Structure formats: structure tokens, C-alpha cells
Amino acid sequence: MTKILLLTITFYKYFISPLLGNNCIFSPTCSEYAQEAIITHGIIKGLWLTFRRIIKCQPFCIGGYDNVPTSIKNSKQPTKKI
């Protein structure tokens, strides 16, 4: 299941995202964040972190550097401006 999910994100990253333009206000991009979150924390926690990240990726958020937390307890760390 994890491989299928990661392949889906990779497909989006290379084939769909370029058509939509580079709109992500974060570094790493949301798709890179999703891949890292799923690899680091597994499917359930990784998808939860990805969901929270995508909700923040909108024009009213400052954006900046927002790396995947090393543990879920640290997931409320503030985003750093770049």
C-alpha cells in the first residue's frame, strides 16, 4: 500500500504539478513533504501530517521552510520563513 501511495505522489509531482505551475509556498514542496512524511511516519500519521500541510498551503499563510517533524510530538513547531 505504501508503494502505491508513493508512486501516486511521484506521478502527481512529475506529470500533474508541472501543468498547474509552481504554486507551493513551502519548502520542501507539498508533494516532497508528503513522500517524506509517509516514509518517516507510515501511512496513517504521514497522511495526517500531509493533510495538515496541504490545509496550510494557501494564500493567507506566510509559507517558508516546513520540514517533516522527526516525531509527532514536535509537529506543532512553527514554520520558518526563508
Curated annotation (Swiss-Prot):
Function, in words: Could be involved in insertion of integral membrane proteins into the membrane.
GO CC terms, sorted: plasma membrane
Family per record: Belongs to the UPF0161 family.
HAMAP family with a match to the protein in the record: UPF0161_YidD (MF_00386)
Domain of life of the organism encoding this protein: Bacteria
Membrane topology value: Peripheral membrane protein
Organism expressing this protein natively: Rickettsia typhi (strain ATCC VR-144 / Wilmington)
Pfam families: YidD (PF01809)
Location(s) in or outside the cell: Cell inner membrane
Name of the protein this chain belongs to: Putative membrane protein insertion efficiency factor
Membrane keyword on record: yes
Keywords of this entry: Cell inner membrane, Cell membrane, Membrane
